[in-house]
Amino acid sequence: MLKINFIKTDDSNIINEFRKKLYKTFVAPIDSMWQDLYIASSQAYLIEKDNKQIGYCCIDNNGALLQIFVNAENKYLMQTIIRNLIDSKLISSASLSSIEPLSFNACLFHSISMQTNTFCYEYSNRALDDENSLNVELVTPEFSNAIRSYYKDHVGFDDTFGYVDNLVSRKELFMALEYDTIIATGECRLSDAQLDYADVGVSVNTQHRKKGLATKMLQQMAHKAIKQDRNPICSTTIDNIGSQKAIERAGFYCSNIIFDINLI
């Protein structure tokens, strides 16, 4: 009789070896925020069949499956493994993208409902618009405190863990100034896990919104990525209509979607 077990683990080396294989199966890049924020903070489990490790999965505190992989010779078991996760009460839902069809479809098979969570975009390699004269400069350490204050006031993000300092040290954070006021910021984060990609993102001063600054900054970040031989990607949630419009105007297209899938 087939015996499948799920073993909690904090052994990142084993998980990373499996994850490298998972990444090779993706039909589009994974969003770095999803990987670095949500998946990274979830609980990893090794999947064992007859006492042999065949893959892993990641489950958050709410019982949502965020990532799962099984090796090639055991792919046929994916639907069974999802069923076992449900029956063992380890998961009640999944938040997965269509970039990995095997696990995504297995969860759809067991689903009772689903909702769209996040749109993930790739760049269409559009040329920089002639009218894009936004003056963008690299953020240097002396501006770090100003950026932190800007994020708190205009984004609602209180950086207490060195986020800004990390981006500045990696030369991945940019800003646009009007006189001495930060009117927009841009990030061009070179992925350490997906070496062909860079995640780009922007924010706009609350007093300077609806002027097209987000689109212009996104275009600038996209071209900074391309100059470093990286393909720009970005994402936004379903409820952020303004961001969706700015992203699409900048020349990005939605290549995959992260769905919340209810399993029970």
Residue spans of the language-model regions?
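Short amphipathic alpha-helix that is part of the acyltransferase structural core
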Residues: M1-P29, N125-D158
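A short, aromatic/hydrophobic, helix- or strand-capping loop or linear motif
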Residues: F26-D36, S95-I99, F157-L167
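Conserved beta-strand-loop-alpha-helix junction that forms the acyl-donor binding cleft
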Residues: S95-A106, C234-K245, Y253, N262-I264
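Flexible, substrate/cofactor-facing loop regions flanked by secondary structure
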Residues: D130-A198
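Conserved acetyl-CoA-binding loop-helix of GNAT-fold acetyltransferases
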Residues: N74-D87, V204, K210-A225, Q244-R249
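Conserved donor-binding loop and adjoining core beta-sheet/short helix segment
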Residues: P29-I86, I182-A198, S203-T206
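Acyl-donor-binding surface of acyltransferase catalytic domains
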Residues: D60-A64, V70-L134, I261-N262
